[in-house]
UniProtKB/Swiss-Prot annotation:
An example Gene Ontology molecular-function term: cardiolipin synthase activity
Subcellular location: Mitochondrion inner membrane
Further remark: Partially functionally complements S.cerevisiae CRD1/cardiolipin synthase (CMP-forming), but conversely is not functionally complemented by S.cerevisiae CRD1.
Protein name: Cardiolipin synthetase
Membrane disposition: Single-pass membrane protein
Length: 639
């Protein structure tokens, strides 16, 4: 390969590498609190023209064809249509979030004390400590008042059993359910062909409290001292988010509660996915009326024009290359002829000098003298060549540096139509959309027994069509393939995608931080901003807020196991609640640290190995626990 070929290959490598870099960020400056987004003048559709932190965005023509004609309202109307078939939705609800776990437990205990008809509590972990004993005591008192009382806890989260804790509650006549005892499912799983439907890894991760069918509580809080704030007797180890729902959505939460005890037959899930397919087909049929004008004609025109320009440029380049080649060949022949003449002249000159020297001195040692002179000349030529090679390397490095700087300058060209969006400022169109539409509350659930994957499907749709902002709070993150790609695509097209998770000191279990760290670079390479919580608590919140209009609070972790567990999320389409959750996200972000891409690339070899090891170990454990499970969309194989 020639020098020019090596230089072009190196330059292409720089462009490819820098297209996935997010390192030249505005670290530590006020500009880091801002997100650059582009928009077409006079339209609500976002069309990014620069990348966030040096990330190569989608090609302009592709972005315009896919997203350029969608306004804020069109996007969220489309999202709502896709989410409508996933779970029961209703209006006229009030959703109040709790960021302080002490307030959440105080409100739940007060509701149990004032219950007159029924108290149904479902949790993943119920510990035998002060908070657990107090909760069970209040349930026992409610049952003695004549309320229908039930406590359902998962045996995977309480593997040692809770017989001593719930003994008195059982004696009072209340219903206590131990969900999926581990040893009852451990041996059948291995003896019956390791069918994933029998796997002991399927756990009930839902946290639901329903009081008198009028109040519904949902979120990430288990029952224990670690989950309750200090003002109510706990130690406040976990930073979590819970919510209370009042309105028709409580009955929808009751349906999810009953679904845990008696999962729906597979036919109901099939009917649900038939509805999804039918809705998708109807939507595509309606949208197909404008496909010719909105997509086919612009695409055909672009390809025709682009192809013509490309062909013309290639022909011009080939013609110029041919001319240069002919010139090089002509100069090469001339140099060869000149060299032959010079060599012949030098040879004749040396022979003539030798004859003269021999005739004058009578000595015949002219050959040795000539050879010594040739060696000196060769040594001088070799030194000159080393100097020239060093200069070529210097020029090459300088050219590469200039090309790299030019690459980033092209990416950072600010279009006059671009605007800065402060973190504390809501998305501009969200308020108008919220005023024009009634607040909608939707209860989503996951149940592997009925092949119900509504929550990851909903998050995938929101990530795919989100307009300007997507903020996710999760203890750790190992999203499945489809959701991972949706996050990366959203970030590439200019959406402010942020993930706030625990750090190596605020993640429980601790090894999940290492597994998440393995894919952090993939997310940041696409423009996703990752924050690590550095507060005094362990991050356990599970929330999503999108475009200052849509909020999700529930028990779903963005990891591979939540796809196989029973989960619940309350999704609320309302501008006011979204503003509250955005403020909470910013409060958590203020005590967090953003992961810098350059520092991430320089992490130690031990950290690289640990991240790879735990990520691989979790994937192996997943395949071992759910051996026969296969779904390409829910696969954890994202690399």
């Amino acid at each position: 390969m020639t020098f020019n070929g090596r230089f072009r290959a190196t330059l292409r490598g720089i462009n490819i590498r820098n297209a996935s870099m997010t390192s030249l960020s505005l670290t530590g400056s006020h500009a880091q609190k801002q997100t650059v987004l582009g928009s077409t003048p006079g339209a609500l559709g976002t069309i990014p023209t620069v990348a966030l932190n040096g990330v190569n965005p989608l090609p302009r023509y592709r972005h315009n064809l896919l997203f350029g004609t969608l306004s804020f309202g069109d996007r969220w109307d489309r999202i709502q249509r896709r989410l409508a078939v996933l779970g029961r939705a209703s209006t006229g609800n009030v959703v109040v979030p709790f960021s302080d776990s002490a307030d959440a437990f105080r409100r739940m205990w007060e509701s149990v004390d004032s219950a007159s008809d029924s108290v149904l509590w479902q949790t993943y972990i119920c510990k035998d400590d002060f908070v657990g004993q107090k909760t069970v005591k209040k349930l026992e008192e409610a049952h003695r008042r004549g309320c229908k009382t039930e406590l359902l806890y998962d045996c995977g989260g309480n593997i040692t059993g809770r017989r001593r804790l719930v003994g008195d509650l059982k004696k009072s006549g209340a219903n206590v359910i131990e969900h999926r005892p581990m040893w009852e499912h451990f041996f059948p799983y291995f003896l019956r062909g390791m069918k994933w439907e029998l796997s002991p890894g399927i756990r009930n991760h839902r946290k639901i409290l329903i009081v008198d069918n009028k109040l519904g509580f949902c979120g990430g809080l288990n029952i224990g001292d670690e989950y309750c704030g200090t003002s109510e007797g706990g130690n406040g180890r976990f930073r979590d988010t819970h919510c209370v729902v009042m309105g028709p959505a409580v009955m929808h939460m009751r349906e999810v509660y009953e679904d845990t005890k008696a999962p729906k037959p597979w036919k109901w899930s099939l009917a649900r996915w038939r509805q999804i397919a039918s809705a998708t087909m109807n939507l595509r049929y309606l949208e197909g009326m404008n496909v010719k004008h909105d997509y086919l004609e612009p695409t055909t025109t672009f390809v025709r024009q682009g192809g013509g320009v490309y062909l013309r440029r290639q022909m011009e380049r080939a013609e110029r290359s041919t001319v240069r080649m002919m010139e090089r060949m002509r100069w090469k022949r001339q140099r060869e002829r000149l060299n032959r003449c010079l060599l012949t002249l030098a040879k004749n000159l040396r022979e003539g000098q030798g004859l003269v020297f021999k005739a004058a001195t009578g000595k015949g040692d002219d050959v040795a003298t000539t050879d010594a002179g040739s060696k000196r000349n060769n040594e001088v030529s070799h030194g000159q060549w080393k100097l020239m090679k060093r200069r070529i390397d210097e020029y090459r490095q300088r050219a590469i540096k200039n090309a790299e700087e030019s690459f980033f300058r092209r990416l950072r060209v600010v279009n006059p139509s671009m605007r800065l969006l402060e973190d504390t400022s809501p998305v501009a169109e969200a308020e108008a959309y919220g005023q024009a539409h009634a607040a909608v509350t939707q209860v989503l659930s996951c149940n592997p027994h009925s092949r119900d994957w509504s929550i990851p499907y909903a998050f995938w749709q929101v990530s795919k069509f989100v307009h300007q902002r997507l903020w996710v709070t999760t203890p750790y993150y190992m999203p499945h393939r489809k959701l991972m790609r949706a996050l990366q695509l959203a970030a590439r097209r200019g959406v402010d995608v942020r993930i706030l998770a625990g750090s190596n000191r605020t993640t429980d279990p601790w090894f999940m931080w290492y597994a998440s760290n393995y894919i952090t670079g993939m997310l940041m390479a696409s423009g996703v901003r990752v924050y690590e919580y550095k507060g005094g608590q362990v991050m356990h919140a599970k929330t999503v807020v999108a475009d200052s209009i849509w909020t999700s609070i529930g028990s779903y972790n963005w990891d591979m196991m939540s796809n196989k567990n029973m989960e619940i999320c309350v999704c609320h389409l309302d501008h006011n609640l979204a503003l509250t959750m955005e403020k909470q996200f910013l409060d958590d972000m203020n005590v967090s640290e953003e992961v810098n891409y350059e520092e991430y690339q320089r992490r130690s070899l031990w950290l690289r190995f640990s991240s790879w090891f735990f990520y691989t170990a979790l994937r192996i454990a997943e395949k071992f626990t759910f051996r026969t499970f296969w779904d390409p969309d829910l696969s954890s194989e994202i690399d």
